């Protein structure tokens, strides 16, 4: 009886280890079609929005700054290689103000395989973006 319990315990442990290893497989992620609606600038000015983009601990960089845009559409596309499933994709929205940039808000989503469209409500506007993620086998 003890031998059977030990065997079942080892089987469960091995199964959990395999499931965990499956989640550690990385793959590429692409972030595109990034746009916003009704962004409100600092005080009464139109914003000069730009993005900072991360996936997990990998910082990809920032987008172009779009001058005086309340409804920006960024032409930028961000590509990351070898990202682990369930990593967090982070987009920060900033207003480029001369001498002092203003953080307008942050969008986060936990990535999953497939192609997804996301909506992120900020205090002063809404951000829309798409991402696709494919885990390597």
Can you say where each PLM-predicted feature lies in the sequence?
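Cleavable N-terminal signal peptides of Sec/SRP-targeted secreted and luminal proteins
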Residues: 5-20
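Universal eukaryotic N-terminal targeting presequences
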Residues: 1-2
């Amino acid at each position: 009886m003890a031998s059977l319990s030990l065997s079942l315990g080892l089987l469960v442990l091995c199964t959990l280890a395999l499931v965990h290893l499956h989640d550690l497989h990385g793959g590429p992620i692409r972030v595109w079609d990034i746009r916003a609606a009704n962004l409100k600038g600092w005080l009464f000015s139109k914003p000069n929005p730009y993005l900072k983009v991360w996936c997990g601990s990998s910082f990809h960089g920032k987008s172009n700054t779009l001058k005086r845009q309340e409804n920006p559409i960024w032409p930028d596309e961000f590509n990351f290689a070898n990202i682990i499933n369930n990593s967090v994709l982070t987009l920060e929205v900033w207003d480029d103000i001369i001498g002092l940039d203003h953080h307008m808000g942050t969008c986060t989503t936990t990535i999953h395989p497939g192609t997804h469209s996301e909506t992120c409500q900020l205090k002063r506007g809404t951000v829309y973006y798409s991402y696709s993620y494919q885990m390597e086998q």
